[in-house]
Amino acid sequence: MKVIVSNKFYYPRGGDCVCTINLEELLKQKGHEVAVFSMQHPENLETPWSKYFPSEVKFAPGLGIIEALRRPFGTREVRTKFTRLLDEFQPDILHLNNIHTQLSPVIAEIAHRRGVKVVWTLHDYKLLCPRYDCLRNGLQVCEECFSDKRKVREHKCMKNSALASFLAYKEAMKWTRMRLEAVTDAFICPSRFMADKMVQGNFDKQKLNTLCNFIDIAKTRKDDYDKENYYCYIGRLSPEKGIGTLIEAAKRLPYPLKIIGGGSLEETLRAAAAGSDIELLGYKHWPEIKEIVGKARFCVVPSEWYENNPLSVIESQCLGTPVLGSRIGGIPELIDEGKTGMLFESGNAKELKARIGQMFATPFEYRQIALDAQKRYSAERYYAKLLKIYTSL
């Protein structure tokens, strides 16, 4: 088959980008012809298809802001360049990932009109929530926009800005559920939780497929699964990730905690962790992540938003490291309590503190956790299910 894989960014910027790049490589390995459609960016990977990428847009005051504000609604440049790609490549399938704002769903409409089958992997809740993360103002879990998109304006959910929230509302009103559903042949939800939310948002259940993300298993393989006496966190240092709750619990405990990542709360957390056995390590590359997470007794994923299918859980388990996760979003689906980790109530520092102690006291079969996870999240397993979706269209 000939497949166009599309994502707004084409470099390892976040989980959606990593999944897109992994998907491209997997399809090529399986003998499919693959083209890429993304936005121009100085950090993009090299590809012969970049000649069709629309220009980079930046949502900041200055030159190009008008084009940036128009882009979410489907601009002439995006339409023209994507049409040229279709003319040259003649795909069977367009596989969308994270395309809103910088590319827009106009490419799904163009492909659909040409008879190209459209598959869309959903990495966030943008089709339900104009903010994409189901967080009112980035702080409080909220589902009001599932049924009434005007709520994004009422609560000023976009940067607490009336203008930004109005634009998000207009974008949602252009790309309505009925419009997107009409041009999409299959949606892929990486978690059952997301699929349930899509049903709650009145999307056609017959078009929803649940398929957990995969990772490059080879990079997680180890010779030994020996552990050291510390636990860890890996991820963005921002409020919705629950890192503040983790620090609150960890400060009251005698166990060393290693934190990998950066973000808006970094300096605040450094001040809060001063004098404790909490170490903020900043950003790390994979070899260091593999070493730190792989030797940790367990990894904590204390999220306070609707995590979909977090790579932090998947990668930790593939390294033989159990996970202590919050009971929210798609996290519980990935953890077999007592066997591959434990769960706690999201945002509950008291319960988290107790669970940390229990995790240190519980003997886990680290090697078995790794072997089972490497099977569950393998490219082979993912591809077998993806191919069934492709061939059913």
Predicted regions and their residues:
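Nucleotide-activated donor-binding/catalytic signature segment of Leloir-type glycosyltransferases, i.e.
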Residues: 267-291
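Short acidic/histidine- and often glycine-rich active-site loop of Leloir-type glycosyltransferases
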Residues: 313-314, 328-338, 342-343
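Conserved acidic donor-binding segment of nucleotide-sugar-dependent glycosyltransferases
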Residues: 337-338, 342-349, 357-363
